[in-house]
Each structure stands twice: as structure tokens, then as C-alpha cells.
Regions:
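Conserved small-residue packing positions in alpha-helical repeats and bundles
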Residues: 20-23, 88
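Phosphoinositide-binding peripheral membrane targeting modules
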Residues: 34
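Extended glycan-interaction surfaces of carbohydrate-active proteins
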Residues: 1-16, 37-101
Length: 101
């Protein structure tokens, strides 16, 4: 999930924590399949070291803006504890929603 259309922060990539947040909402409203799909994507973003980044710049909205941000501020934040926390919130939301249904 992206922050907003036209985002250029590190190219406007997909945000791990926002995707997990959306999955948590989906679980809360009963869309368990959608929530599981978001969880699968989030978990596919773990590095070999077990880190989750702030965002993923594989398919940026503004590819020409990735390099300027990296040159100015360095690589995308990783690990980002907020992403890790939202992953756990989504896992819990899915577990709780599955137990109710």
C-alpha cells in the first residue's frame, strides 16, 4: 500500500506498515482472505536477517526520485520497528478474527 498518489518520498514505494494496517482493518471487517494476502506480502518483505523496511522501492511511483532521496538521506530505514510492530498487530488480528468466525 502506498501513502498517497504522487508521493515522491524515496520514490513513493509501497509501505510495509501501511499494508499491515490495511490488513488489520480487513481482518476486523471480516475480509480474512484480503488480510491474509496483505500478511503474505508483508512477510515476503523480510530480509534474510529478519528485518522489515519502512517502504519498498521495487515499484516506485516516481522512479527518478529514489536516487535523490538515497543520496541525501541514505537508504530506506531498515529495520523499522513500526513495520515489525504492525506485522505483529496483523498476525494477532488474523488470529483473533479466525477464532471468532
Amino acid at each position: 500500500m502506498r501513502r498517497y498518489l504522487g508521493d515522491t518520498f524515496y520514490g513513493g514505494g509501497e509501505w510495509v506498515l501501511l499494508t499491515a494496517w490495511l490488513g488489520t482493518h480487513m481482518a476486523a471487517v471480516g475480509d480474512l482472505e484480503g488480510a491474509r494476502q496483505r500478511l503474505d506480502w508483508v512477510e515476503s518483505m523480510f530480509t534474510a536477517d529478519g528485518d522489515l523496511p519502512e517502504q519498498v522501492t521495487v515499484h516506485p511511483q516516481a522512479p527518478d526520485m529514489v536516487a535523490p532521496w538515497v543520496m541525501r538521506w541514505g537508504p530506506v530505514a531498515r529495520p523499522l520497528l513500526w513495520s515489525h510492530g504492525m506485522h505483529l498487530v496483523l498476525v494477532r488480528a488474523l488470529r483473533d478474527a479466525s477464532a471468532v468466525r
